[in-house]
A protein has these predicted regions:
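C-terminal accessory subdomains/tails of enzymes that are appended
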Residues: 2-237
């Protein structure tokens, strides 16, 4: 549970489903990276028949309040996040014996699409698609330092500015934050991300105050984590 890994069984399961839908025979040799995780499913309530298959469990969320007053939301999925938030806030308001109208229906999220921006070149369009209304911040960063407009990792769509932006504006604090979460480099091409791990670490080091020792630690930790994924996939072959 602490470290779920994608096994060879998982890979073959996905490949079997994929090959049933496409004409090209896709094999494990075509896989450049994998991802695995856990879904926060809510267990069936008392009185309901409990299935042993996770596929049968509900994706619905549940808001509950403990006797001590702690409000908890469990389950759910990304596509229903606004409903999850609404139900949670409604429970808080009920607990506080107050009421208020929801104001988020037309509220743009940070990075929402900015259709008014006049973007034409390839880099600008990439930033718009990735960062929406925040794209102007990255564009200004690149204007001040042209090297930030260069690729972060060869063959992947991300720019060096995106790693710096992640540290300055998105609370990225580790190399893994950059390569796995703020960008999806690890999922798109794990081998390429490993090959560029040191370069990325050296790029963000000044912004995080890392010493050479910390750079080495970050790179080693990331590479070992990726190696664990490779070993998990090979373990059941």
């Amino acid at each position: 549970i602490d470290d779920p890994q994608c096994t060879n069984v998982d890979i073959n399961y996905v490949l079997k489903a994929l090959n049933a839908a496409v004409t090209t025979n896709v094999t494990a040799d075509d896989v450049t990276a994998v991802w695995s995780g856990l879904r926060p499913l809510v267990k069936s309530v008392s009185g309901e028949k409990i299935s042993s298959r996770t596929a049968d469990l509900s994706r619905r969320h549940k808001v509950s309040k403990s006797q001590s007053g702690v409000i908890t939301i469990a389950g759910g999925k990304l596509t229903t996040y606004r409903k999850m938030a609404q139900d949670t806030v409604d429970q808080v308001l009920e607990t506080l014996d107050t009421s208020a109208r929801c104001k988020t229906k037309t509220l743009k999220l940070i990075g929402a699409e900015n259709s008014s921006a006049n973007l034409e070149d390839k880099t600008a369009m990439h930033l718009r698609d990735r960062f929406g209304s925040e794209a102007k911040i990255l564009a200004e960063m690149i204007e001040q330092d042209l090297s930030l407009g260069e690729p972060l990792i060869a063959g992947l769509p991300y720019l060096r500015a995106e790693a710096v932006f992640a540290v300055q504006h998105e609370m990225a604090r580790t190399l893994d934050d950059i390569l796995s979460r703020r960008t999806r480099s690890r999922i798109i091409n794990r081998r390429a991300s490993v090959a560029s791990a040191r370069n990325v670490a050296e790029l963000i080091a000044p912004y995080l105050g890392w010493s050479e020792q910390e750079i080495n630690t970050q790179v080693l930790s990331y590479c070992n984590s990726c190696a664990d994924e490779d070993h998990a996939a090979l373990a059941l072959q």
